[in-house]
Regions:
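Glycine-rich and polybasic anion-binding loops at the starts of cofactor/ligand-binding domains
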Residues: 2-189
Length: 189
């Protein structure tokens, strides 16, 4: 019967689609590799080790059990870049804050802003981690964890000591810049 799809036509389309998706994952790895090289500071040994894990694991495909229902192709269709920090005022932070009575820490494009954050955070302890301080061991190692850790350029550890309680909640205000292009900013600058 002419015009009806045959098993070989269906299988060929599936094979071509799998090849397209595999190429998309390879291209995404190359793009993130360029971002890794564009970091503003030299990557630590820990960041380089995480990047090697990204390369070793690769991005999961549709047959990967944990990711089979997650359409990563839409994520890979975007271009990512490190954003430039916009000028943000305290008044703008106040207008964007949803929780008025809290210890507020402000992050602009993923970078901690001490000038816009509350100076006093009650019992919460803030520590800026140097690049040479190793990351804590991952609970579950996976490619996006390693990608995040390899691109991170600044780390802030927030800790509430055992037995301590705060009269106010801790509010993390993340402000991200954007533009009209299809470029997606990473929040690791």
């Amino acid at each position: 019967m002419a015009g009806l799809p045959t098993n070989s036509n269906v299988l060929e389309r599936q094979r071509l689609e799998q090849q397209r998706q595999e190429q998309q994952r390879i291209d995404a790895l190359k793009h993130f590799g360029q971002l890794f090289k564009q970091r503003q500071i030299e990557p630590s040994a820990d960041a380089r080790a995480h990047w090697q894990q990204v390369l070793q694991l690769g991005f999961p495909g549709s047959k990967h059990e944990d990711w089979k229902y997650t359409p990563l192709e839409r994520l890979f269709a975007h271009e990512f870049s490190f954003p430039h920090a916009p000028d943000v005022t305290t008044a703008q932070c106040d207008a964007l804050s949803l929780v008025p009575n809290a210890h507020r820490l402000v992050f602009i494009n993923g970078q901690f802003s001490p000038t816009l954050s509350d100076r006093e955070c009650g019992p919460y302890q803030l520590t800026h981690a140097a690049e040479n301080v190793p990351f804590p061991t991952a609970i579950q190692s996976e490619v996006f964890l390693h990608l995040t850790e390899s691109l991170a350029q600044e780390r802030l550890h927030i800790r509430l000591p055992v037995g301590q309680h705060s009269d106010k909640s801790l509010y993390l205000l993340h402000i991200s810049s954007g533009n009209d292009s299809d470029m997606v900013n990473t929040s690791h600058s």
